[in-house]
From Swiss-Prot:
Homodimer. SUPFAM superfamilies: S-adenosyl-L-methionine-dependent methyltransferases, Winged helix' DNA-binding domain. This is Myricetin 3-O-methyltransferase 3. The keyword S-adenosyl-L-methionine applies. The gene is MOMT3. It comes from Solanum lycopersicum.
Length: 361
């Protein structure tokens, strides 16, 4: 009779917490196995199969390995691990001849790691998070306390934004991750927020390669968009219909438009810099215009739900990468807006982990 763990009941609370504690180090293993699975195209191979249900040997035969037979044995262990983490389902059947056949197919969780109909997925963000350049920063995390150092700067000798200009490979990894996450976020924003309706012109401040604007204009093609960022950033931006890329510095001035978008900008900077950015937006805004801020938001109390856990996790990332960058509470965002001169602060929607905030004069 096969051994199953599903019917084991652990009622001793001390034992439960000890077992949870013993499992904590395994979090690293999951991320690194997922990285390997993405690099090997495991999830895409399963998704593209006609049955979407493959054995380890069938998957190994589609990987450029020197020995599919031996590789399938190693792969079987990886697939079983991923199934135990809810990234795959494991199907065990017996053939007429009595032989056991094991196959695997995707789950909703692993579906997020394959390309969707828009050509985006979470996979590039996982590759960024587990990239050696990013991981090396965490070895200096304690220095943020001991020495007041920014871990990324300590690990690489330069500010994170400067490093991108020195390492084209990592810059490509970063840009691809941001492109995918932005597309996923904005698709959801456009499903739950209608504040772009009737708008004629939008400027995306710190818009990078123009992904957010492109998403908005794909739904509202009559909008004219200005993608505003540093000249060396927009020089690599692709051409989009309805979007003009304009070089400039948001700390000096912002071009005038009826709607100003700030997506994932404020969490990169300290309070003083944020107020400076928001004041420039206030000056550029007509009386009936609005600033749309899209950011994660922390609860006042560190709750243990998904939204709270993610915002506090990203806050640790900001601490690792940037000087002064951080996630903020509703009150902290509202205080920044008031200091910049805005009189109306509205939270109008939530898209996954992001909140949509409207600011008015």
């Amino acid at each position: 009779m096969a051994l199953s763990m599903d019917n084991i009941v652990i009622s001793n609370e001390e034992e439960i917490y000890m077992m949870k504690a013993m499992h904590i180090p395994c979090g690293l293993y999951l991320n690194m196995v997922l990285r390997a699975a993405i690099e090997l195209d495991l999830f895409e191979i399963i998704a593209k199969s006609t049955t979407q249900k493959l054995s380890s040997y069938e998957i190994a035969s589609q990987i450029p390995t020197k020995n599919p037979n031996a590789s399938s044995l190693v792969l079987e262990r990886i697939l079983r691990f991923l199934a135990s983490q809810s990234f795959l389902t494991c199907n065990i059947t017996k053939n007429d001849d009595g032989n056991v056949h094991t196959s695997y197919n995707l789950t909703p969780l692993s579906q997020s790691l394959i390309l969707d109909k828009d050509g985006t997925s979470i996979a590039p963000f996982l590759l960024l998070a587990t990239d050696p350049v990013a991981v090396n920063s965490w070895f200096h995390f304690k220095d943020a306390i001991l020495e007041g150092e920014i871990p990324f700067n300590k690990a690489h000798g330069v500010h994170a934004f400067e490093y991108h200009g020195k390492d084209s490979r990592f810059n490509g990894v970063f840009n691809k991750a941001m492109q995918n996450v932005t597309c996923i976020d904005m698709k959801r924003v456009l499903e739950c927020y209608n504040g772009f309706e009737g708008v004629k012109e939008i400027i995306d401040v710190g818009g990078g390669l123009g992904i957010s604007l492109a998403s908005i204009i794909s739904k509202y093609p009559n909008i004219k968009g200005i993608n505003f960022d540093l000249p060396h950033v927009i020089k690599d931006a692709p051409t989009y219909e309805g979007i003009e890329h304009v070089g400039g510095d948001m700390f000096k001035s912002v071009p005038q438009r009826e709607l100003i978008l700030l997506k994932a900008i404020l969490h990169d900077w300290d309070d003083e810099c944020c107020v400076k950015i928001l004041k420039n937006c206030w000056r550029a805004l007509p009386k009936d215009g609005k600033v749309v801020v899209i950011e994660q938001m922390q609860p006042e109390y560190p709750e243990i739900n998904l939204i709270s856990k993610n915002s506090f996790s990203v806050d640790m990332l900001m601490m690792t990468m940037l000087d002064g960058g951080k996630e903020r509470t509703k009150q902290q965002f509202e205080d920044l807006a008031k200091q910049a001169g805005f009189t109306v602060f509205k939270i109008v929607a939530r898209a996954y982990y992001c909140w949509v905030i409207e600011l008015y004069k």
